[in-house]
Design a protein with these regions (language model features):
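A conserved regulatory-domain signal marking ACT and ACT-like small-molecule sensing domains
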Residues: 1-143
């Protein structure tokens, strides 16, 4: 991916589980099952009290099996993602995320989750909002 590249994925599902002493083991089991499949979208975020997994709905059965017995807080199907590759100097750019989120909010798009690494960010939205969200992101000119 080059700076400014945009990747859109659809048919995603989000699971949020209450943290437990066994949850990280369950994640390992899931990764054993899906780790070889390059076409599967997967992101994992662990907070203080909850853990969220967002992945392709084609892997739902693995989540249902691997995380059986864990406390499910919520499940949200019919999601989509937009991933943007940022310039390497983005870490030194004050207000970058404010600028992006403001534009998204002005269009009335509900951001369900935001996932980021050093040089890319991923917005998770309802599949119903993906076209509008893509249009907004495409116009941002953040390359």
């Amino acid at each position: 991916m080059e700076s400014g590249d945009i990747t859109v994925r659809s048919n995603l599902v989000k699971y949020t589980f209450r943290n437990s002493s066994t949850l990280i083991l369950r994640q390992g089991q899931l990764l054993d099952k899906i780790g070889h499949a390059k076409e599967i979208f997967y992101t994992y975020s662990q907070g203080v009290y909850e853990t969220t997994i967002i992945l392709s709905n084609s892997a739902e059965e693995y989540v249902e099996t691997c995380f059986r017995g864990e406390q499910l807080v919520s499940k949200a199907p019919n999601l989509a993602s937009i991933t943007v590759k940022l310039p390497e100097e983005n870490s030194n750019c004050s207000g970058l995320y404010y600028y992006i989120f403001k534009k998204i909010a002005w269009e009335g798009i509900n951001l369900l989750e935001v996932v980021s690494t050093t040089n890319e960010f991923t917005l998770i939205v309802s599949q119903d909002d993906i076209d509008k969200a893509f249009s907004v992101v495409k116009r941002l000119n953040i390359a």
